[in-house]
């Protein structure tokens, strides 16, 4: 699987076998060192023996377009680091290399900012625990243009999201008070509204890799279904008609990478399948729609 960035207007592929930078910090150990009695050389400031670990992180600087993307290694003492990968990234940026660039905000799996590929899996760095036994490789979300280091360009992703009109469209909005729905109708939105638009699912989808200019991808399609399934929305038929073309919806081939990688345990593949069914046999009443939330 290749990762892409922008260099002089062209996409440059970085394969996992790419050589590390000559500036990579070397780290090695031996059985004797692991079994040695702690001394001032191998004891951290906490008084515990150091638990050293390497993080190999994708680096690319748009200000130096002639330099190829590379993996740069950083060594941390896990006894001085929080338990999550995002904790390690923040420690590296604060204490070792301030040029390292990545997105982050809430640190609790709500905002979706820190989505990246960690050890081959798209996930949120704030929810991914550090593997204490093996080196960790961190890349940006795959098959996206790269702004810098671990920051993907999500311009096209948000353009597609805007295209589905992600808001209620109703002909019967109450003139006063709330626009109510029954508990059963509300229950049909579980497993849909929790999406945080992190793009982990879309960037894990091979169909989206090759057709992202026209295929909307699992995240956006699940959000499209979220509004179709809402009992307060009166434009479900029009929303489905907008997807009636070769690429927008039907490039989904039920590979299901999207459902496997979702850090919120949602099922975009199931939502996409329901859109296809609605378009084939007609949409059911809101209160009769299948429940998308995992049991």
From Swiss-Prot:
Residues reported in the UniProt entry to bind [4Fe-4S] cluster? 195, 198, 201, 262
Organism of origin: Mycosarcoma maydis (Corn smut fungus)
Q: What class of enzyme is it?
A: oxidoreductase
Q: What is this protein called?
A: Succinate dehydrogenase [ubiquinone] iron-sulfur subunit, mitochondrial
Free-text comment on the cofactor: Binds 1 [2Fe-2S] cluster.
Q: Which residues bind a ubiquinone?
A: 210
Effect recorded for residue 253 to L: In carboxin-resistant mutant
| Residues annotated as binding [2Fe-2S] cluster | 106, 111, 114, 126
Which is an annotated Pfam family here? Fer2_3
Cofactor needs: [2Fe-2S] cluster; [3Fe-4S] cluster; [4Fe-4S] cluster
The root-end lineage is:
Eukaryota, Fungi, Dikarya, Basidiomycota, Ustilaginomycotina
Tell me the Gene Ontology biological-process terms attached to this UniProt entry: aerobic respiration; mitochondrial electron transport, succinate to ubiquinone; respiratory electron transport chain; tricarboxylic acid cycle
Please describe the quaternary structure of this protein: Component of complex II composed of four subunits: a flavoprotein (FP), an iron-sulfur protein (IP), and a cytochrome b composed of a large and a small subunit.
Q: Where does [3Fe-4S] cluster bind?
A: 205, 252, 258
Main role?
Iron-sulfur protein (IP) subunit of succinate dehydrogenase (SDH) that is involved in complex II of the mitochondrial electron transport chain and is responsible for transferring electrons from succinate to ubiquinone (coenzyme Q).
Keywords, comma-separated and alphabetical? 2Fe-2S, 3Fe-4S, 4Fe-4S, Electron transport, Iron, Iron-sulfur, Membrane, Metal-binding, Mitochondrion, Mitochondrion inner membrane, Oxidoreductase, Transit peptide, Transport, Tricarboxylic acid cycle
Which reaction equation describes what this protein catalyses?
Answer: a quinone + succinate = fumarate + a quinol
Give yes or no: UniProt keyword Iron-sulfur: yes
Family statement: Belongs to the succinate dehydrogenase/fumarate reductase iron-sulfur protein family.
Identify the GO cellular component terms for this protein. Answer: mitochondrial inner membrane; mitochondrial membrane; respiratory chain complex II (succinate dehydrogenase)
Q: Which domain of life is it from?
A: Eukaryota
Q: Which PROSITE patterns match?
A: 2FE2S_FER_1, 2FE2S_FER_2, 4FE4S_FER_1, 4FE4S_FER_2
């Amino acid at each position: 699987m290749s990762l892409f960035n922008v260099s002089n207007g062209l996409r440059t592929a970085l394969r996992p076998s790419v050589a590390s930078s000559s500036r990579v910090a070397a780290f090695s150990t031996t059985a004797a060192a692991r079994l040695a009695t702690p001394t001032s050389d191998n004891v951290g400031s906490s008084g515990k023996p150091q638990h050293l670990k390497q993080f190999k992180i994708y680096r690319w600087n748009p200000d130096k377009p002639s330099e190829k993307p590379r993996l740069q290694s950083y060594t941390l003492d896990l006894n001085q680091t929080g338990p999550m990968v995002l904790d390690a990234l923040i420690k590296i940026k604060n204490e070792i290399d301030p040029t390292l660039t990545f997105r982050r905000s809430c640190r609790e799996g709500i905002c979706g900012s820190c989505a990246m590929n960690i050890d081959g899996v798209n996930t949120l760095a704030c929810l991914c625990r550090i593997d204490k036994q093996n080196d960790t490789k961190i890349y940006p979300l795959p098959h996206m243009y790269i702004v810098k280091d671990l920051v993907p360009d999500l311009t096209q992703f948000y353009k597609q999201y805007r295209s589905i009109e992600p808001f209620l469209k109703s002909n019967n909005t109450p003139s006063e008070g709330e626009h109510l729905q029954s508990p059963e109708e509300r229950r049909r939105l579980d497993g849909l509204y929790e999406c945080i638009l992190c793009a982990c699912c879309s960037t894990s989808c091979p169909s989206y890799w090759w057709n992202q200019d026209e295929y909307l991808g699992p995240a956006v399609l699940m959000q499209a279904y979220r509004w179709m399934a809402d009992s307060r929305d009166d434009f479900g038929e029009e929303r489905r008609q907008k997807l009636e073309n070769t690429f927008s919806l039907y490039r989904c081939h039920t590979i299901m990478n999207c459902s496997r990688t979702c850090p919120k345990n949602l099922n975009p593949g199931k939502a996409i399948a329901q859109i296809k069914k609605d378009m084939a046999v007609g949409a059911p009443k809101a209160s009769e729609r299948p429940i998308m939330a995992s049991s």
